[in-house]
Curated annotation (Swiss-Prot):
Region (Disordered), start-end ranges: 213-235
GO biological process: photosystem II assembly
Signal peptide limits: none
Keywords from the named record: Coiled coil
Organism placement in taxonomy: Bacteria, Bacillati, Cyanobacteriota, Cyanophyceae, Nostocales
Annotated function: May be involved in photosynthetic membrane biogenesis.
Protein name (record): Protein Thf1
Native source species: Nostoc punctiforme (strain ATCC 29133 / PCC 73102)
Record field: compositional bias (Polar residues): 222-235
Cross-referenced Pfam families: ThylakoidFormat
Coiled-coil regions, chain positions: 183-204
NCBIfam families: PS_II_psb29
Similarity remark: Belongs to the THF1 family.
Amino acid sequence: MNNVRTVSDTKRTFYNLHTRPINTIYRRVVEELMVEMHLLSVNIDFSYNPIYALGVVTTFDRFMQGYEPERDQESIFNALCRAIEQDPQHYRQDAERLQAIAKGLPVKDLIGWLGQTTYLDRDADLQAQLQAIANNPNFKYNRLFAIGVFSLLEQSDPELVKDEKQLTEALKAIAAGLHVSDDKLNKDLELYRSNLDKMAQALVVMADMLSADRKKREQRKQQSTAPVAPPSSNE
């Protein structure tokens, strides 16, 4: 019998692959995503699909925006995927393929396709995946899949995802066609967008703190290098 990998195993592998320290504000993001991906990877009902991959890539790219040094972002993403014994290039390629499809489709056609009321010949693999999801009573719905759906809609029509009514209607149609809970879709995406806002606010606060600290250091440096006036002859 094969031993199921634990979260500790995955974390150990990750930190062996990416050995440089991760900035504090981003470490929680990386570890939460790592745990989420790990738990799905060991779930018997979970199977990889390109919409999930798009959700992983979107989540990572959005929450890691502004990470310094920028060159470490690729190393962190690669380690994240390899820690759960997955190929990072596979995730990236599937995500890019789906983004390109969504950009080339009117959003109504995309919603119909995702909701399985319209059949398009744009991508046979995605069509097969959508049908497999809709026909699988044990499909393991997850937050990253929801983010993948949201990312597709956003790529097709950025304005639609800003309109709560239109977004809710789109998610309802997609959920009905794929036989997943539209309530879960909406709640997961509300939390996702809320967390993005919180992350953006935290980055602003951090930037302000760094700027203030830099100014203080510059002031101290100027004071330490300022010439000391000699005592006057009257003293």
